[in-house]
Curated annotation (Swiss-Prot):
GO cellular component: myosin II complex
Protein's recorded name: Calmodulin
SMART domains the record matches: EFh (SM00054)
Binding site for Ca(2+) 2: D57, D59, N61, T63, E68
Family: Belongs to the calmodulin family.
Ligand binding (Ca(2+) 1): D21, D23, D25, T27, E32
Residues that hold Ca(2+) 3 according to the record: D94, D96, N98, E105
Function, as annotated: Calmodulin mediates the control of a large number of enzymes, ion channels and other proteins by Ca(2+). Among the enzymes to be stimulated by the calmodulin-Ca(2+) complex are a number of protein kinases and phosphatases.
Pfam families according to UniProt: EF-hand_7 (PF13499)
Length: 149
């Protein structure tokens, strides 16, 4: 299933994997998965984390390695984001609930994910998605950006 991914997608997933793999040992544990999910405003139980790992843990060793992660991501992409998932993702970024994602909100979420971005990088991300040029990302722009991936 991971065969359908482009080199660019694989490179993006490698970057995402390393955000999860906090200690850099090449595997994602339930603890590491929990850390990332909590930084995104989720609050999974230990059992839910274990279920998520088990769902993709092909060799049954209790952790996710990169090939297993790729397979999970390929599956998720095939199921493309539902409206509900997009709304939830938008809410993670739109911290004050005003229906717009500001540069500060974007920087906050990216920092929580361990991505230290310069102001220029954050501004560039906003500019890329900001179709109407108001300096913020609204829901329609967010959906367009997510679907373009």
């Amino acid at each position: 299933m991971a065969d359908n991914l482009t080199e660019e997608q694989i490179a993006e997933f490698k970057e995402a994997f390393s955000l999860f793999d906090k200690d850099g040992d090449g595997t994602i544990t339930t603890k590491e998965l929990g850390t990332v999910m909590r930084s995104l405003g989720q609050n999974p139980t230990e059992a839910e984390l274990q279920d998520m790992i088990n769902e993709v843990d092909a060799d049954g060793n209790g952790t996710i390695d990169f090939p297993e992660f790729l397979s999970l991501m390929a599956r998720k992409m095939k199921d493309t984001d539902t409206e509900e998932e997009l709304v939830e993702a938008f809410k993670v970024f739109d911290r004050d609930g005003n229906g717009l994602i500001s540069a500060a909100e974007l920087r906050h979420v990216m920092t929580n994910l361990g991505e230290k971005l310069t102001d220029e990088e954050v501004d560039e991300m906003i500019r890329e998605a900001d179709v109407d040029g108001d300096g913020h990302i609204n829901y329609e722009e967010f959906v367009r950006m997510m679907m373009a991936k």
